[in-house]
Amino acid sequence: FRDLELVKKELQFFLDHKVPQVKFVDRTFNCKHDHAMTIWQYIKDHDNGITNFHFEISADLLRENELELMSTMRPGLIQLEIGVQSTNPDTIRAIHRTMDFPKLAGIVNRIHSFKNIHQHLDLIAGLPYEDYDSFHRSFNDVYALRPQQLQLGFLKVLKGSHMKEMTEEYGIVHKELEPYEVLGTRWLPYEDILKLKMVESMVELYYNSGQFQNTIACVEPLFEDAFTLYEKLGQFYEKKGYSEISHSRMRRYEILLEFVKEELEEQSAGKSGNQDPEVENPAGKAAEDCRGMETATWEKVADSMIYDLYLRENLKSHPSFEYDQKPYEKAVWEYRRQEKVPKTAHIEVFRDGKILLFDYENRDPLLHNAAVKEIQI
C-alpha cells in the first residue's frame, strides 16, 4: 500500500487545484480498513466543496465506523462503485469470489438512507454458470437496490486470466482483438449476448441517465419485473428501427410513451370489456409509482414524463404530450406576480389537478434536480 503521508500530499494537490473528480484505481479499496478509513477521514476534513472522489469497494466488507463516517460527508464528496457481477452462487464460486449478497444489499440500502452518496453497482454477462434466465434474476436482484447507476458489462477474457485458462471447459468464445470481449459461452449463446446488449442500451438510456426516474417507476408495474421492462423496450426499439438512429432527449420520451401506449393496448386486449386501459400496480408501491397513483395509464405516464423533464430544466418549448396549460395562464401569471416568483422558476398544472412549482435556484445536491413544492392558484 502507498505511504499514507504521500497519499495525503497528493490528495491535497488535487483539492488545492479543485479537480472535479479523482478516481482511485484500487480494485477493492476498503480491503485494508485502517488505510481506507484514514483516506476517507482526510478527504472529509479537507473537503473543498467541489472535488468528488470515486472508490471501487466491496460493500459487504464495510465496517460500522466507515459507514458512520460516510453518513457525515457532503453530498457528492464520494461515490462508490460496487462490483456485484452476479448473484448466482455457482457463478460466484466459479470466479473465486466471496460475497454475502444479503449483507451487501443491507449495506447498499443503508448508504442510500444517507442521501449523500452515488452508488454504482455492476453486473457482468458471460460468466460461468450464468445463462439468460440466471442473468435475468441477477439483474432483478441488483435493480431492486435502486443504485444511481446499474452498469451492465460483458466478460473480458484477458490473456493470463483464470477465464482464459478455462476457455475450453466453459465453451468461451471471445473477440480476438482487445478488449477480448465474450461472444458466447456454454450457458450463454451469441444470440442471448445480443439480447443483453440491447437491454444494456435501454438501461443506459432510461435508467442510468437519471432523466426518466419517475416515469420508469410509473411504468415498471406494467411488467412482470424490471428486466422484462428493459427487454421489451429494447425489442420495441428494434421492431421500429429506432435502435439504428440517434435521438434527442425529447424523442426518447416520445418513444417511451409510444411503447407504453402499445403495451397498455396489448394488455387491455387481453381483458374483456376493459375500454379504458388501466393496469393495477401489483406491488402496491403507491408512494413510489406514478407520483403517488396506484395505477398506470397513458395520461399518468405522460404526467410523470412532464415531471421528470421539468425536474432537470425549464423547457423552452412544450412537449406534445403535455397537459394543455392555456386555461391556467392567467391564474399562473397572477400567482407569479403576487408571490414574486422568479422568472427562472416554472409552474406546471398536471392532469391530476396538482400544481407544482419547480425552483431551479435550489437543487438537490446529489441528483441536481430542482426543488419542487405544491401550490394553489
Regions found by a protein language model. Give the residues of each.
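Radical SAM enzyme core and accessory elements
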Residues: 201-377
